[in-house]
Regions:
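Short low-complexity, flexible loop/linker segments enriched in glycine and/or proline
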Residues: 116-117, 173-174, 279, 299-302
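Membrane-proximal basic amphipathic "stem/tether" segments
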Residues: 1, 292-309
Length: 309
């Protein structure tokens, strides 16, 4: 039987035991506490299968949404997931939620069409082979860019903190975007700090040897069998020197030969996907789920609100 639990009713020790078997960093209780402090849950059979509920309220309407800095959530199970099991959880979402736009995870598959399901792209690279074999599978353009990077006197630095990564982003590409505000960047910085303290993340940057200017930097989340490229910053000088190609190659090189998957965390953006696929990874699809139970008037208000986002 699937139960709906409020935040205070969740046994986080049991919850995390289930998530550990699934290897998804985003669904750990501490991670959810950082990105959505009052998350709730659907739980079946003493945490044999679980699903986080990340809800909000606008104009008096309860709705579900995907928190920032979380690519995949959905149903997690100690046993292989079936479509029937997934659908039973989706049907168990409390009726108070009138609208939802949430992303599920790559272990969830649908053999037949389900209303509200769409698919998104991720790129994964198996690191359980020697580095030379991995590099041999890089696309030609990636090999050229890496050769250019290696001729640019670059070096890896480990003295980077979350604030440096966020600032590098906000001062460059982030200055052209209005997707996130100060609260979101503060949350990301705090998330990075907590993850590093928990040994669930590492942060690396790239500079030119003898020059202190940070060309690029990134936050990488990690579990026992997965490294996730969560967030990065890159300045124009770094782009010109192929610093990000160098950084990702260094992480791949350091972790090659281990039973680890490198998760590029995206992307539906064609240019980013091409860049990530250039490292020889495989495209993996994961689903999202949308429903709309609003009245006609509510749907009209929602349309206006989404148009302002």
């Amino acid at each position: 039987m699937i139960q709906y639990l409020t935040h205070n009713q969740i046994d986080k020790k049991k919850w995390d035991a289930t998530i550990t078997e699934c290897g998804n960093i985003y669904a750990y209780s501490w991670y959810l506490d950082m990105v959505h402090p009052h998350w709730e849950a659907l739980v079946e059979d003493d945490y044999q299968a679980v699903m986080p509920i990340t809800g909000g309220k606008k104009f008096g309407v309860n709705y579900l949404y995907q928190p920032y800095f979380v690519q995949q959530l959905g149903v997690f199970s100690k046993q292989p997931l079936t479509q029937e099991k997934t659908e039973s959880f989706l049907k168990a979402i409390p009726s108070k939620y009138r609208f939802a736009e949430i992303r599920l995870n790559e272990s969830i598959t649908f053999d037949k069409e389900v209303q509200g399901i769409e698919y998104h792209r991720n790129v994964l690279l198996d690191l359980n082979q020697d580095y030379e074999s991995i590099r041999a599978n890089y696309h030609q353009n990636t090999k050229r860019n890496l050769a250019k990077a290696e001729s640019n006197n670059l070096q890896l630095v480990t003295t980077v903190i979350p604030y440096h990564v966020v600032a590098l982003f906000t001062d460059n590409r982030g200055a052209l975007l209005d997707k996130w505000g100060d609260a979101e960047y503060a949350r990301l910085t705090a998330l990075g700090k907590v993850a590093v303290q928990r040994n669930s993340a590492f942060i690396l940057g790239v500079t030119e040897k003898g020059v202190g200017l940070l060309l690029c930097a990134a936050i990488f989340m990690k579990t026992a069998n997965r490294i996730t490229f969560l967030f990065s910053g890159l300045r124009q000088e770094g782009k010109d020197r192929q610093a990000m190609t160098y950084l990702l190659d260094q992480v791949i090189q350091q972790n090659a030969g281990q039973p680890i998957t490198f998760d590029f965390e995206g992307s539906d953006d064609e240019n980013l996907a091409r860049f990530y696929l250039g490292f020889g990874g495989n495209e993996v699809k994961y689903p999202s789920y949308t429903f709309n139970r609003l009245s006609p008037a509510g749907k009209a208000v929602l349309k206006v609100w989404k148009g302002r986002k």
